[in-house]
């Protein structure tokens, strides 16, 4: 494997997992804070808010998993290496 392609793949994998975890991490913190604020304002709606929060957190976490998959493909099954 070309050393330039190998080093670029490692750098791209690091960027993929770093950026893929940054956005959802910030969004999950924001969503959790807003959900807690909503529960504090309307305690009777706690069940609906919690269910919606857990579903949205799962969708946000899937973005991080996609970034992990891209990073693993770049590291171990690199399509650019011949």
UniProtKB/Swiss-Prot annotation:
GO molecular function, one term: lipid binding
Domain of life: Bacteria
InterPro entries, alphabetized: ATP_synth_csu_bac/chlpt, ATP_synth_F0_csu, ATP_synth_F0_csu_DDCD_BS, ATP_synth_F0_csu_sf, ATPase_proteolipid_c-like_dom, F/V-ATP_Csub_sf
Known regulation of activity: Inhibited by dicyclohexylcarbodiimide.
Membrane topology listed for this record: Multi-pass membrane protein
UniProt GO cellular component terms: plasma membrane-derived thylakoid membrane; proton-transporting ATP synthase complex; proton-transporting two-sector ATPase complex, proton-transporting domain
Chain positions of site Reversibly protonated during proton transport: 61
SUPFAM superfamilies in alphabetical order: F1F0 ATP synthase subunit C (SSF81333)
Record field: transmembrane: 3-23, 57-77
Subunit structure: F-type ATPases have 2 components, F(1) - the catalytic core - and F(0) - the membrane proton channel. F(1) has five subunits: alpha(3), beta(3), gamma(1), delta(1), epsilon(1). F(0) has four main subunits: a(1), b(1), b'(1) and c(10-14). The alpha and beta chains form an alternating ring which encloses part of the gamma chain. F(1) is attached to F(0) by a central stalk formed by the gamma and epsilon chains, while a peripheral stalk is formed by the delta, b and b' chains.
Function noted in UniProt: F(1)F(0) ATP synthase produces ATP from ADP in the presence of a proton or sodium gradient. F-type ATPases consist of two structural domains, F(1) containing the extramembraneous catalytic core and F(0) containing the membrane proton channel, linked together by a central stalk and a peripheral stalk. During catalysis, ATP synthesis in the catalytic domain of F(1) is coupled via a rotary mechanism of the central stalk subunits to proton translocation.
Family indicated by similarity: Belongs to the ATPase C chain family.
Name by which UniProt lists this protein: ATP synthase subunit c
Source species taxonomy: Bacteria, Bacillati, Cyanobacteriota, Cyanophyceae, Acaryochloridales
Chain's gene name: atpE
